[in-house]
């Protein structure tokens, strides 16, 4: 059989996959496009996201190492404000760790069961994270706008129950979406073909993703606007009993949270809406997709952009908590002070040791 790429000035390691794709005269350009797409997938969907998820894992781990001991010291009134915050931190930590592992699984041939379990944990982390955002936002709203109702009617037990409901709903959604996602990348108890099954899955995933993100965004926007109006109202009626620092801290945290959520939602819904209208015949190793390789740049970029944004969002969330939560900020500032003292003493001891050695040599 004649090699269709033998006269090309550019040669790729992917040529053996497409030797039978003879129904084109533009094979030299198309094989270059395949190489570019694979490079985009390697760097923007594997290497860079893996680095971001490692950073997110370290930040969330450090944040939880501060938050959990502080949470244990809190009284019941303060704990009500931090139950969903702890849940959010745990979800972010597990999400970043699972996303790291999934990047590595893409390099291996894995069974449906393994993919399902990892997608299940991954989706469970993200859906519980979304619910934690909603829960913590509503509690923040009640604590600042309706403090009497919050202190009398909302007990720690009620907040724990809402947190449990959030986890149960996340489990139901995660099982559903994990089955769909695993069926796309590996054959399981049912086969998802690209002509009939995948379009339905794309639509279902788009509806689930859009609903999951719109609810937190609407909640965050409502509470943020309400807090701004509440501040103006208290100032206009001359109510100086309300601590303005409370409103300022709440608005700052909500603004950063809303920014993070908007970033996540856009990077989830835009690619998902694009995939709903995209018809893919089969995997990229099939001739049909080889012939349209020059049209696959946008799907590759969309998929990579989605992953990168999740990595950034998982970094922004604990970083905002470390910077804007006074209780957490106080602890890590003490850690930095102690570390600087230890480094200073170590440097001083090293200098003295070198100086004594020079004196002895003389």
Swiss-Prot record:
Disulfide bonds: none annotated. The keyword Transmembrane applies. It is a multi-pass membrane protein. One of its GO terms (cellular component) is plasma membrane. The keyword RNA-binding does not apply. It is found in: Cell membrane. Glycans are attached at residues 7, 20, 23. Gene3D superfamilies: Rhodopsin 7-helix transmembrane proteins (1.20.1070.10). PANTHER family: G-PROTEIN COUPLED RECEPTOR B0244.10-RELATED, PROTEIN CBG16518. This is Putative G-protein coupled receptor B0244.5. It comes from Caenorhabditis elegans.
